[in-house]
Curated annotation (Swiss-Prot):
Residues 339-378 are annotated as: C-terminal tail (CTT). Changing residue 365 to A: Abolished ability to activate IRF3. It comes from Mus musculus (Mouse). Activated by anticancer drug 5,6-dimethylxanthenone 4-acetic acid (DMXAA). The chain crosses the membrane at residues 18-34, 45-69, 92-106, 116-133. 3',3'-cGAMP binds at residues 166, 237. Residues 35-44, 107-115 are lumenal. 2',3'-cGAMP binds at residues 237, 262. This is Stimulator of interferon genes protein.
Length: 378
């Protein structure tokens, strides 16, 4: 599906452009070596030397990490030293490749300018200084890419928790509760745009407890019938939703089930607590990823996707006015328009039959002599 239908500010998943640029650099470097007329065997030897140096440097860095992880074998690796070694050193093929290449250069002839012991000492010095000076850390973009790829973001956990612990429980029975509500309240939620749960996603994570304070044109009307579910040892845990009336120019313009996405309160509280180490920029990034992840989850669950609509918005910071009630009305009317389009009957008007479309008929005259084609001669 396209990323993202919710809001232009929500980022798309990262692609593979970095690998494409690396491929361009690879082709450019090969062209430079070809123009310089460097002997291929000389290029391959030094290329293998650099690869061996890189692998050896990674091994030294990982051994330093292993020294720390061995102190946490019981708590982090269930007492398995092998798991700790694998977590730090990774695939042993890299280590074997480094050893083979190092041995190759040690026994290589005609390389008087290359001393393995000198290279090893210089490499250890470089890696030690790099770790002490903090030169080995990833850039913020690399950290963000790794967290998104491995699903390690705070937003990923919040989105799944919100879906499994709340939306998956209430959305399947939402239509039955709406029908019960309509029987008691004169079909208040009978409109095509009123039969869904509208969830508000302010990207600044400002989630007040009273919607009428945010916008006086959003007025509380009533509560849907409660849903009781036995959950995590809690008998008859109550889930409830609120029905709001939306005003436009002082007149009722729509009725819907409306609420904020409560995990946004968690993100806001984390950004206010210094112990969480969560900056305002982190909060904005995680709020966007939370919306995108929840959209991806709902996209694969039709019974949940068809019962709710996400309203993602970002209030302008340049002083321009923003009306939450108008934003909600826009989504309600869009929902009604989509509902009418989906339910419109597929009718087609058949063209009137023409003479050429009729079956051919054989006309036989009862006269003895044939008549001419020109009627003016009769």
């Amino acid at each position: 599906m396209p990323y993202s239908n919710l809001h232009p500010a929500i980022p798309r998943p990262r692609g593979h452009r970095s690998k494409y640029v690396a491929l361009i650099f690879l082709v450019a470097s090969l062209m430079i070596l070809w123009v310089a007329k460097d002997p291929p065997n000389h290029t391959l030897k030094y290329l293998a030397l650099h690869l061996a140096s890189h692998e050896l440097g990674l091994l030294l860095k990982n051994l330093c990490c292993l020294a720390e992880e061995l102190c946490h074998v019981q708590s982090r690796y269930q007492g398995s030293y092998w798991k700790a070694v694998r977590a730090c050193l990774g695939c042993p093929i890299h280590c074997m490749a480094m050893i083979l290449l190092s041995s190759y250069f040690y026994f290589l002839q005609n390389t008087a300018d290359i001393y393995l012991s000198w290279m090893f000492g210089l490499l250890v010095l470089y890696k030690s200084l790099s770790m002490l000076l903090g030169l080995q850390s990833l850039t913020p973009a690399e950290v963000s890419a790794v967290c998104e790829e491995k699903k390690l973001n705070v937003a990923h956990g919040l989105a799944w928790s919100y879906y499994i612990g709340y939306l998956r429980l209430i959305l399947p029975g939402l239509q039955a509760r709406i029908r019960m509500f309509n029987q008691l309240h004169n079909n208040m939620l009978s409109g095509a745009g009123s039969r869904r749960l509208y969830i508000l996603f302010p990207l600044d994570c400002g989630v007040p407890d009273n919607l009428s304070v945010v916008d006086p044109n959003i007025r509380f009307r009533d509560m849907l019938p409660q849903q009781n579910i036995d959950r995590a040892g809690i008998k008859n845990r109550v889930y409830s939703n609120s029905v709001y009336e939306i005003l436009e120019n002082g007149q009722p313009a729509g009725v819907c089930i409306l609420e904020y996405a409560t995990p946004l309160q968690t993100l806001f509280a984390m950004s206010q607590d210094a112990k969480a180490g969560f900056s305002r920029e982190d909060r904005l990034e995680q709020a966007k990823l939370f919306c995108r992840t929840l959209e991806e989850i709902l996209e694969d669950v039709p019974e949940s996707r068809n019962n709710c609509r996400l309203i993602v918005y970002q209030e302008p910071t340049d002083g321009n006015s923003f009306s939450l009630s108008q934003e909600v009305l826009r989504h309600i009317r869009q929902e009604e328009k989509e509902e009418v389009t989906m339910n419109a009957p597929m009718t087609s008007v058949a063209p009137p039959p023409s003479v050429l479309s009729q079956e051919p008929r054989l006309l036989i005259s009862g006269m003895d002599q044939p008549l001419p084609l020109r009627t003016d001669l009769i």
